[in-house]
A protein has these predicted regions:
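Gram-negative bacterial Sec-dependent N-terminal signal peptides
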Residues: 2-17
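Flexible, low-complexity junctional segments that flank or bridge functional domains
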Residues: 4, 18-200
Length: 200
């Protein structure tokens, strides 16, 4: 728990900001940290470093752990970020400690903004796929548990991953006895609900 205290404080700070924003406007507005969120992150780092029974310094090593855990918490199944997104933020992987100590939460908020954009892109693509005819004559497979998978290398690989995911979702409902029209409506509503949740 001690290793995740700072992560929790940062997540809480971000969720507080998101909760005060109207859902319809989140996609068009880039989230920015407010003073209270910055102070919460600084406070958490000081508590971890000074008062916990086993002091955990907020240093470069801890920064790297926080960075990795943050991406894992946002996209543990590697369905939204591509490798280029990870590479883009890699130079600041060991600098979160400096950012927090300097009361600058731009990095985690920038990461979250990219996450929101990627989420909207992926779900939008999934909903477009529902308008096409599924081809079940092709012999192919997909990795269901992607926790240990590599990040998709590019947008083309990500789109193919989502094509297989939508096809799998469709097939499951088909095997449950649903007709194509009902499947399309069910999945469209499901994907829309995903998007609504991430906007809140």
């Amino acid at each position: 728990m001690k290793k995740h205290l700072l992560m929790v404080a940062m997540a809480f700070a971000m969720s507080t900001q998101a909760a005060t924003t109207q859902p319809e406007r989140v996609a068009a507005t880039q989230l920015k940290p407010i003073a209270a969120q910055t102070q919460a992150a600084v406070w958490a780092s000081r508590v971890m470093g000074r008062y916990h029974y086993k002091a955990t310094p907020l240093d470069d090593a801890m920064s790297e752990k926080i960075f990795d855990k943050y991406f894992e918490s946002l996209d543990g199944e590697k369905l939204f970020f591509v490798q280029a997104d990870i590479d883009k933020f890699a130079p600041v992987r060991d600098k979160l400690d400096d950012a927090i100590n300097n009361e600058n939460l731009t990095i985690p908020f920038s990461i979250y903004s990219v996450y929101q954009a990627r989420f909207a892109e992926r779900i939008g693509h999934a909903r477009e796929l529902l308008k096409t005819k599924m081809d079940f004559t092709v012999d192919e497979s997909m990795q269901l548990d992607r926790e240990k998978a590599a990040w998709p290398k590019d947008d083309a690989e990500m789109k193919d991953l989502w094509r297989k995911r939508v096809k799998n979702d469709w097939l499951r409902l088909k095997l449950a006895g649903k007709e194509d029209k009902a499947i399309r409506e069910t999945l469209d509503k499901r994907y829309d609900n995903y998007q609504t949740r991430v906007r809140k």
